[in-house]
């Protein structure tokens, strides 16, 4: 007689997670986390601004405004603005890392990779890219170098100042737009939809620059997408930080051309443009030239040949057992009389 199988008593199924408009599989939903992050940035910035205002008022110069004695892009002025941006976003992201129980480095700037090979390769690539864009304009007789602007000890100081400044620019802008925001939005809507959104925000942030044009803003958005591509393939922001710094350093300091319509100060070379705006970028500078999008596409193609694997760790929730996976256990009691 066949031995019957007796079903063992089964425990009740685990309670199904209760999701709300505020909480999802990853805890607090991505949109709310972004809003909390932005609120922290605004709150920290307001607090620092109030403290600075109090200090200035106590010194009896509440109505005074800082003046650096020059008009144009200076290492000091740029370092102050970009350093403030980096401080605000880094502190806000650190607070969010405590709330989310994540390492701060998950947001794109792991300390173990700081200023490593990817950063320096990216820096060299950024300098080559701006050089290629200007070379294209030169071939159409729209660009020429007219002389050397800075010499001697002043040149040495300018090299050090601009190098440090543009590393800070790369760190601040990459982390602000492609650090915590990119990571969190990826958890909510996927990597490339998040990349498109952060790149558009990157363009909007540059729209207020003096002399900016539609062509220049298009290039800024393309830069944002390219930097997201670097992040996707390398797994962190260090390649993008290097490329960003190398491009800006070459454009502003080395070649001495305008960046978003702002002329540089204590640059190495003097340069001049001649020709239609589509070729030279006009008052905006080479970022608004037709050659810049072409160069960025070439950079993306070459980069994809050397960095073939996607190393970006997608934010995912822990796997949860489903009721359908809980198969009933059976016990064979052996032959029955």
Predicted regions and their residues:
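Membrane-embedded alpha-helical segments of multi-pass membrane proteins
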Residues: 83-88, 159-163, 217-222, 294
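Small-polar-interrupted transmembrane alpha-helices in polytopic inner-membrane proteins
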Residues: 130-131, 162, 166-167, 190-207, ...
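Functionally important transmembrane alpha-helices
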Residues: 216-277
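Membrane-interface helix caps and helix-loop-helix hairpins in membrane proteins
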Residues: 148, 205-214
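Juxtamembrane helix-loop-helix connectors linking adjacent transmembrane helices
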Residues: 52-80, 98-175, 182-187, 316, ...
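Membrane-interface helix/loop boundary segments of multi-pass membrane proteins
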Residues: 16, 172-197, 229-236
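N-terminal, membrane-interfacial amphipathic/helix-forming hydrophobic leader that caps
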Residues: 1-104, 108, 252-337
């Amino acid at each position: 007689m066949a031995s019957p199988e007796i079903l063992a008593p089964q425990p009740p199924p685990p309670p199904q997670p209760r999701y709300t408009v505020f909480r999802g599989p990853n805890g607090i939903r991505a949109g709310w986390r972004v809003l909390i992050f932005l609120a922290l940035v605004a709150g920290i910035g307001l607090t620092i601004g109030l403290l600075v205002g109090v200090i200035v008022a106590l010194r009896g110069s509440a109505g005074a405004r800082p003046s650096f004695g020059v008009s144009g892009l200076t290492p000091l002025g740029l370092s102050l603005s970009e350093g403030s941006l980096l401080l605000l976003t880094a502190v806000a992201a650190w607070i969010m890392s405590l709330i989310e129980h994540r390492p701060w480095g998950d947001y794109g700037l792991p300390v173990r990779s700081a200023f490593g090979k990817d950063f320096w390769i990216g820096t060299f690539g950024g300098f080559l890219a701006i050089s290629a864009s200007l070379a294209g304009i030169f071939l159409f007789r729209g660009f020429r170098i007219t002389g050397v602007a800075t010499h001697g000890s002043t040149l040495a100081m300018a090299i050090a100042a601009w190098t440090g400044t543009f590393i800070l620019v790369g760190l601040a802008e990459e982390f602000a737009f492609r650090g915590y925001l990119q990571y969190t939005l990826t958890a909510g809507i996927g990597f490339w939809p998040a990349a498109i959104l952060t790149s558009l925000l990157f363009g909007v942030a540059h729209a207020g620059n003096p002399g900016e044009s539609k062509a220049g803003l298009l290039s800024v958005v393309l830069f944002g997408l390219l930097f997201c591509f670097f992040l996707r393939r390398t797994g962190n922001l260090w390649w993008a930080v290097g490329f960003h710094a190398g491009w800006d350093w070459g454009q502003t300091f080395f070649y001495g051309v305008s960046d978003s319509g702002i002329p540089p100060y204590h640059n190495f070379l003097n340069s001049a443009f001649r020709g239609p705006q589509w070729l030279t970028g006009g008052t905006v500078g080479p970022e608004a030239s037709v050659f810049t999008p072409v160069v960025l596409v070439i950079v993306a193609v070459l980069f994809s040949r050397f960095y073939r694997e996607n190393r970006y760790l997608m934010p995912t929730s822990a796997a949860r057992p489903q009721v359908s996976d809980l198969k009933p256990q059976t016990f064979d009691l052996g032959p029955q009389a």
